[in-house]
């Protein structure tokens, strides 16, 4: 949709399909309306009753997708879902040492979904009459039970319908529901919780730290960025050994040589983290990850990346897959990340490896494009490189300059705000500061004259977002 919008002829059908689907997911039974986060999948055509397991690898991409939907449409449903999901991740899915856990089980006390289910009497006991009336109308407690004699909360009426039904303003409805949900959340917390899969998986941490860094940047919330940085730091300290990644850890035990997804997703996460908050150590590590990707995973004859490294135990057949499945394609994420790192550092070696991957994958992409969205994103970044902006200045000045970009949908623009005292490789060090903040705007390897005027900077952001906002926003 974004690409068609830039031509002046946006494909509104595509956007509607995506927004409508996400709206039904975020308002229906796939979303935890008290604690945040998405369940694994729906078991019915109405998307009302889920399999109650919560997976880290689902919630990372969905967190990021909700924020993109919010910045396009202005619909606070998506913003609220993103915030509640990010808060759930920090509250329940991040260890004290920083790593993100893998999943929450569907069962508690031997019953599917028991932790999440309600009945009208138990809800009414927690709320006053006005709170109960509103919440029952909103989440279906005034309708027949929908799961084995119990009620699983799903949105039946939106805020506008509730405001009309109860003759209250939208703000009043939101305030009352927020209070009521808080009471139910506190009561639910006293129940026996679902089991926690406390493995820390490198690949899934890469997906989530990318989403949390993106959320922190879009919402101007340093706590989310700090959460992402803590995850990266955990992986670096516990799962980066002898300049190679390990795939999983639990407690003090880390093991298994990492796979393509581990390297690709961590590289992608670090590049997003660098956009949220610059730290040169993450750039250095990103380069190391990219180097291992090329040295240990690339098919030297045909291009593309194997799932296992060259020094992995010998297999009957080494897999090299290109399509997306439950998680994005490792080849697609690797190619796009290598392109971005190559553009940032003016390093042809990374760009050429991505090009070889895209050429190797082309037949597979061409046969079933819809199954290769990650590689199509990488192909888009190769054919039409993203606008890459490097902003230099003091930390205080950078914060002020970046403010206009918060909450904006700019899918083809990457902004790296680098403090003046950062230690940098030559290509970035050449983008030096002057007496004030300066922004270097590049596409691929070509850079325009630097911008030092805040007015020019705001104009650049406006130009990049003008065609990507819904008219009714």
Residue ranges of each PLM-predicted region?
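Glycan-recognition and catalytic cores of secretory/periplasmic carbohydrate-active enzymes
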Residues: 1-473
């Amino acid at each position: 949709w974004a690409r068609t919008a830039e031509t002046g002829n946006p494909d509104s059908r595509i956007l509607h399909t995506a927004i409508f689907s996400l709206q039904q997911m975020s308002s229906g039974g796939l979303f935890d309306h008290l604690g945040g986060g998405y369940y694994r999948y729906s078991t019915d055509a109405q998307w009302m009753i889920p399999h109650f397991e919560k997976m880290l690898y689902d919630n990372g991409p969905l967190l990021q997708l909700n924020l993109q939907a919010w910045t396009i449409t202005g619909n606070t449903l998506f913003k609220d879902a993103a915030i509640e999901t990010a808060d759930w991740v920090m509250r329940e899915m991040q260890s004290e040492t920083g790593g993100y856990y893998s999943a929450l089980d569907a069962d508690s006390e031997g019953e599917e979904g028991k932790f999440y289910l309600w009945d009208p009497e138990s809800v009414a006991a927690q709320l006053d009459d006005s709170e109960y009336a509103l919440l029952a109308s909103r989440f279906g407690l005034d309708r027949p039970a929908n799961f084995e004699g119990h009620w699983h909360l799903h949105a039946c009426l939106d805020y506008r319908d509730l405001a009309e039904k109860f003759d209250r303003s939208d703000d009043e409805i939101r305030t009352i529901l927020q209070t009521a949900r808080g009471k139910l959340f506190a009561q639910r917390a006293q129940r026996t919780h679902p089991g926690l899969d406390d493995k820390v998986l490198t690949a899934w941490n890469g997906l989530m730290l990318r989403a949390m860094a993106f959320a922190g940047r879009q919402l101007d919330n340093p706590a989310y960025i700090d959460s992402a940085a803590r995850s990266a730091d955990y992986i670096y300290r516990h799962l980066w050994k002898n300049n190679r990644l390990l795939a999983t850890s639990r407690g003090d035990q880390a093991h298994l040589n990492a796979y393509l997804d581990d390297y690709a997703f961590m590289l992608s996460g670090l590049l997003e983290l660098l956009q949220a908050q610059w730290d040169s150590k993450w750039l250095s590590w990103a380069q190391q990850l990219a180097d291992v990707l090329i040295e240990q995973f690339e098919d030297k004859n045909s291009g593309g990346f194997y799932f296992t490294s060259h020094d992995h135990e010998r297999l009957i057949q080494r897999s090299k897959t290109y399509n997306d499945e439950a998680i994005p394609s490792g080849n697609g994420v690797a190619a796009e990340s290598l392109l971005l790192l190559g553009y940032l550092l003016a390093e042809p070696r990374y760009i050429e490896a991505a090009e070889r991957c895209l050429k190797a994958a082309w037949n597979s992409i061409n046969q079933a494009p819809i199954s290769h969205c990650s590689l199509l994103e990488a192909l888009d970044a190769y054919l039409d490189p993203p606008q890459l902006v490097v902003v230099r200045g003091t930390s205080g000045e950078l914060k002020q300059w970046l403010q206009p970009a918060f909450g904006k949908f700019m899918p083809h623009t990457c902004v790296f705000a680098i403090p003046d005292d950062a230690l940098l490789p030559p290509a970035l060090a050449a983008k030096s500061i002057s007496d004030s903040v300066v922004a270097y705007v590049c596409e691929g390897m070509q850079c325009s004259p630097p911008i030092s005027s805040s007015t020019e900077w705001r104009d650049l952001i406006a130009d990049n977002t003008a065609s990507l906002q819904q008219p009714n926003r």
